[in-house]
């Protein structure tokens, strides 16, 4: 009888414990498990994934030194990537003869110990050599020197926080998840510099990307519920953006007034443009490109693809990351404008009103995007700023320039003109070189302002897709330092 009573008591005790567990909130149970265990995520077996998002060779002819920056002298690069996670090496396929890889579609995943917080990650960018010579390690590191350690990137990833530090970190000059080989000061030096975008994440039970440990120990959210889109502190920005960029999603911040990188975009606008790669701690330059439909005879008024790539390279290597909405984006605002053989100033204003603002003077793009339209021909000039945030270039006039001087490069002509007018929206108005007496070799200004090697100088506008750094004496100007990223909002 005593044995039966003892068994009955044990069963009742077990049942009560079961009920207690069943009614206890899931997040509270998980918090107890975390604090009493070395497992940083008891819901899953943790794997860490490094995803390569974009690669760009900074291959460009620089007027500043009359030399070409390149990765492979004989051809476009044959890029491939090596990723090392906790000493386990992964190698991507080779992307042959490609300077710009916008969708590599490659990642490396490694299972890691669930009870060790820090994971070592190395990223290397290589140019394959099919001639029998050794493959070349490209420079994507901020470190100086010529050793392999000064070219690859070494990171430490935390499975506790979901963030990493090392050669790339939150708030660094090139941006989080973006590597720039020119960060060592080698912009106008030949060091096989390149740009590489990447992300690191880990297995996450609820799929919101926020690690279990952060949800349970910092935010008090349920690690079994996807919290994407939630804004519990009601500051206008969701939890996943605030976590990613190091803000506290449980404490309201004045994101409408915060602009830590002073690029003119407040944090609400940085969040809205994050789908296109913006970073609240690194300067971004957004430009909407509208273009004109072909003429009845088939003449086009578009910005050449090669010009776009030159613009990306020129801005990106200076860590002013260029975002050109040319119609290829998801959520694009770019449009094709009906053909007009001769566009008056008043018609330019109408184009801006109808195709950029769309009649809405509170359009969210106003104050976020510059507006640069390619028309067939202006009635006044082949390129000009017609408002603080807007400008045009005329394809017909630029094609005539190419026809008159055949040795000029068409991509450079368009790229230089587009960058020149963008410069005015950045408040670059140089004293020298930007006048009617400096545009041709038979003019005195051409020779006097030769040290100012910038597309803002009429003597270089069609041969240079770059601004000057002011390093060539008294008759030079530092456009990069003098520009005002907020001027277009005036």
For the regions a language model picked out, list residue spans one by one.
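Secretory targeting signatures
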Residues: 1-34
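Bacterial Sec-dependent signal peptides at the C-terminal "C-region" and cleavage site
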Residues: 22-41, 342, 346-357
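Peripheral membrane lipid-binding modules
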Residues: 69-152
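C2-type phospholipid-binding modules
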Residues: 127-202, 456
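Extracellular calcium-associated, cysteine-rich motifs in secreted modular proteins
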Residues: 200-302, 307-309, 313, 318-359, ...
């Amino acid at each position: 009888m005593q044995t039966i009573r003892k068994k009955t008591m044990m069963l009742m005790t077990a049942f009560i414990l079961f009920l207690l567990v069943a009614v206890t909130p899931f997040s509270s149970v998980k918090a107890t498990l975390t604090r009493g265990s070395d497992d940083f995520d008891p819901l899953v077996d943790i794997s860490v994934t490094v995803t390569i998002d974009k690669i760009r060779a900074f291959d460009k002819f620089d007027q500043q030194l009359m030399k070409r920056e390149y990765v492979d002298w004989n051809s476009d690069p044959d890029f491939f990537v090596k990723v090392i996670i906790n000493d386990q090496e992964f190698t991507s396929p080779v992307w042959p003869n490609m300077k710009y890889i916008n969708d590599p579609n490659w990642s490396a995943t490694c299972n890691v110990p669930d009870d060790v917080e820090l994971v070592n990650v190395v990223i290397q960018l290589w140019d394959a050599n099919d001639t029998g010579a050794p493959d070349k390690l490209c420079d994507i590191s901020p470190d100086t020197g010529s050793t392999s350690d000064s070219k690859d990137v070494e990171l430490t990833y935390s499975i506790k926080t979901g963030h990493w530090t090392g050669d790339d970190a939150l708030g660094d000059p090139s941006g989080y998840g973006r590597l720039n080989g020119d960060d060592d000061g080698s912009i106008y030096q030949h060091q096989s510099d390149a740009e590489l975008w990447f992300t690191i994440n880990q297995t996450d039970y609820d799929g919101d990307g926020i690690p279990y440990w952060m949800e349970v120990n910092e935010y008090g959210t349920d690690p079994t519920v996807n919290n994407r889109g939630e804004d519990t502190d009601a500051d206008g920005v969701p939890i996943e953006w605030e976590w990613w960029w190091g803000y506290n999603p449980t404490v309201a911040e004045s994101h409408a007034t915060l602009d830590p990188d002073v690029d003119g975009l407040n944090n609400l606008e940085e969040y809205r443009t994050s789908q296109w790669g913006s970073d609240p701690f690194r300067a971004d330059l957004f430009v909407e490109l509208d273009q004109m439909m072909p003429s009845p005879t088939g003449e086009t008024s578009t910005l050449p693809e090669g010009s776009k790539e030159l613009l990306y390279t020129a801005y990106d290597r200076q860590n002013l990351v260029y975002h050109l909405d040319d119609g290829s984006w998801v959520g694009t605002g770019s449009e094709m404008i009906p053909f007009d053989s001769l566009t008056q100033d008043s018609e330019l204003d109408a184009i801006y009103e109808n195709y950029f603002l769309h009649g809405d003077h509170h359009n969210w793009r106003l104050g976020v995007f510059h507006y640069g339209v390619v028309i067939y021909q202006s009635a006044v000039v082949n390129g000009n700023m017609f408002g603080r945030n807007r400008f045009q270039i005329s394809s017909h006039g630029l094609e005539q320039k190419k026809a008159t001087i055949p040795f000029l490069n068409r991509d450079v002509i368009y790229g230089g003109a587009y960058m020149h007018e963008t410069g005015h929206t950045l408040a670059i108005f140089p004293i020298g070189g930007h006048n009617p007496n400096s545009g041709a070799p038979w003019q005195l200004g051409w020779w006097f302002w030769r040290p100012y090697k910038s597309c803002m100088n009429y003597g270089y506008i069609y041969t240079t897709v770059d601004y000057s750094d002011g390093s060539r004496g008294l008759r030079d100007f530092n456009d990069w330092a003098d520009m005002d990223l907020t001027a277009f909002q005036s």
